[in-house]
Amino acid sequence: MIRKLLILSICIPMFCGGQIFADECKPSGDLRYICGPVNAEDILPLGNTKWLITSGMNGQLINTHDKGHIYLVNRRDKTFEELFPGKKPVFRPDKKMFSACPAPIDPENFSAHGLALKQISTNRFHLYVTSHGEREAIEVFEIDAQGRKPTISWTGCVPLPDNMFSNSVAILADGGFVVTKFFDPKVPDSFNSIFEGKITGCIYEWHPGGRVKVIEGTELSGANGIAVSKDNKWVYVAASGTREIIRFNRTQSPVKLSRVRVSIQPDNIRWGDDGMLYTTGSNYVPPDECKSSDCNTGWSILRIDPETLKTIRVTGFDQTATLQKASTAIPVGNEIWIGTYSGDRIGYLPEP
């Protein structure tokens, strides 16, 4: 069904075309690449280690036959490898925590999209993944980075409603989560409606032992990236369809949304060590000005003050950069790492 949605008469810059195959891996100015990771839509650091985790979406959204992956990246020597499924995927189901999970993940039919990490002890983490494929679910893993190289095991899942194409997830203190509904795959033309600024999704919340529930009043156009404050009180969301950053207090009912308009189609939202939020996305161009399948618009990185929602453009690259369709930007050390949902590489550049 998703494939049918994407046979469009107009190429929407955020999602159409621009898939990069194995061409040269030369830098685009200050932007350097690690070539090989396919559709690495999201990137997160494993604490203070030298390791990064990236997602790897399957080809469902961009009409390719790519399979889903989770990648491990060494940010010091700039190498990567497949972490999951790998040669021998490990399954250690936590049936008490994830009692509604019907079966282990199918390593041949999943799509690792958005990521969230929670540290549970020294160099041990829970990883939550918005996943598509055989089922729409939050797939949960445990990563142990105490040894020479991190290991991963699948531990459970939380099935999501079947009228939901999820995008991003953020973990709450009790092991629950908030997750964005990007669009409804059961509604004809729901995906395209995002780019008309129409309501297509909202925010859901889940807690252990409970059900996945809508947070009323969070209806948005293309609810995409999501982040929560340290006290779990404030939620920040990227609304791609209306090109907005949203903030609300999840402890209040009904919620009241604060909004700020931005110049890009914002994707993932990530915290930096400086206490600021960072987002990236394709530079906005009206669809009727970008009709060809190879149309690229470049992308920009924005820094957002979580208190005022004031945004500042940090840097960006035009349509000539080899990496296009940027979906995540996260400062790690003295670098910013860039992911894309449509390509064969991740990028990194010195933090300006």
PLM region spans:
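A short helix->beta-strand "capping" segment at the edge of beta-propeller domains
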Residues: 23-39, 152, 312-317
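Beta-rich, blade/repeat-based domains predominating
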Residues: 37-48, 65, 89-119, 154, ...
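Beta-propeller domains
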Residues: 53-91
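Short, conserved, GDST-rich strand-edge loop motifs in beta-rich repeat architectures
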Residues: 54-68, 129-130, 179-198, 279-297
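Beta-propeller blade signature
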Residues: 67-76, 137-145, 197-207, 296-307
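Short loop/turn segments immediately following beta-strands, especially the blade-tip
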Residues: 142-150, 249-252, 306-308, 350-352
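Loop/turn-rich, solvent-exposed surfaces of beta-rich toroidal or solenoidal domains
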Residues: 263-316
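Blade-level signature of beta-propeller repeat domains, shared across WD40, Kelch, NHL, RCC1
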Residues: 325-352
